[in-house]
Design a protein with these regions (language model features):
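Patatin-like phospholipase
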Residues: 1-41, 49-149
Length: 149
């Protein structure tokens, strides 16, 4: 008999994360986690991050924090710099919201947490599993967008 697996897939789309946070908050509040695999695309990776930590506090504040103008500069298109300062945003966000990384490690034990990333050259989807100490680069890669296609 073949074992069936259940996946929770959270899409990206910037502010659609507000809706996704509402769903995952309800799952947390009801201790609902029948999932074997967690797959996040773009902002969905960040939403799953907080779901797997089991953090429901301040999710609106997290979305507003990420939308602040401090981290976004369209003029950087012309200077060759990053349009969105993801590294700085995550660094500042970790100080402000203090995520418990041990919780996420415990909650994915024996399960898969996957980030979907678009290859910048070929525009193909690539799938990256998370392991110890690999959170930041994979989250940032999933969140970054190619501007010109």
């Amino acid at each position: 008999m073949e074992d069936k697996k259940t996946a929770l897939i959270i899409e990206g789309g910037g502010q659609r994360g507000v809706f996704s946070f509402g769903i995952t908050d309800t799952f947390i509040n009801r201790a609902y986690d029948p999932f074997d695999i967690y797959i996040g695309v773009s902002n969905g990776v960040a939403v799953l991050y907080w779901y797997l930590i089991r953090e429901t506090d301040n999710n609106l504040e997290k979305m507003l924090f990420a939308a602040k103008g401090d981290y976004l500069s369209y003029k950087n298109i012309f200077t060759g710099k990053d349009i969105f300062k993801f590294h700085q945003m995550f660094k500042d966000g970790e100080k402000m919201f203090k995520p418990n990384i041990e919780n996420i490690k415990n909650n994915i034990d024996g399960k898969d947490y996957i980030a979907v990333v678009t290859d910048a050259i070929e525009a193909n989807a690539e799938y990256y599993s998370f392991g110890d100490d690999e959170w930041m680069p994979k989250m940032i890669a999933s969140l970054e967008h190619c501007l010109f296609w």
